[in-house]
Amino acid sequence: TMSSKTQLEIGPRIMRSEMEYLIHDLNHAVNDLPDRFYCYPAFNLKSIGEFLENGSRFYRDVHEAPEYATPECLGARGVVAAEIVGEKIVQASVESETLRRAARTKVPPPKPLRAFKQLIDIEGKTRGHHENYLIRRKADLKMVIIPAITSHFMSRSIFCGAGSLRKDTKDGKPRFTLIEKGWGIESTDSSASTTKKPYVNLRDEPHAAEYTWMRLHVTGGDANIAPWAIWFTFASTSAVLRLIESGIDLSDLELESPLHAMRVFASDPSLKATARTIRGKNVTALNIQEALAERVDQNI
């Protein structure tokens, strides 16, 4: 580790998020919803998918889901503000559609449309809340960066997990867990975002000078409503990336079975559950986050 705080790079980082919203409509068949959402007033742009005035994009994703992508921000506070704006745009869109139906039929629909930041629907299909971080191209993404940051991703649910109810395998009763999207994740990393369902997508599209920058595209995290949880998601991940970019060793925190550890941590709201590191030490999610916070504090 480095002893001088000035050795760790400090400064703004470009980051952004993308959210595929789930729309609940109990007035019509679910399978024709995408076509009707496409006609919402919020989509009446000159060209579907163009940028909005605040630099964001609101469009229909390849999976037919309405998606809001924030503009590029220079820090976690900017992402929080941009996500809140996105929530208001989506909410205004569904409210406009409800009013349009009432005007057309002369009778208000019995049940209003509702938009949710929900990543797994009742059929078990997953949607995405994606995080994007611009990082310096100093090390190999798959061989160095992913192993170093995975323990952070697997344990950060203690402060940024959205939570979910899952049936207990023993008695079938619903149990509260700390994560939602994580139950549908199949690998820590992959270049195939839809078939392998990775926590990190290896697609490297920095949209910047590619010899200097790369993009970390995180697809396995949860979506949050609470501003502090959104901020913590991006601020903590950016801080850990600073450690990695500066060459600080995090190998003692690498987990033996990352996805298993994530689910073990998430299944215990008391935060006492442990998982084994590659060095044979049993650690809790809180142990990992405390160790990362200590190293950030020592070096920033």
Where are these regions (language model features)?
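Terminal catalytic/cofactor-binding subdomain
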Residues: 1-116, 145-162, 166-167, 190-201, ...
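Short, solvent-exposed loop/turn segments at secondary-structure junctions
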Residues: 73-75, 120-122, 138, 183-185, ...
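Extended, Lys/Arg-enriched charged tracts that mediate electrostatic binding to polyanionic substrates
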Residues: 136, 175-187
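A short alpha->loop->secondary-structure connector
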Residues: 140-143
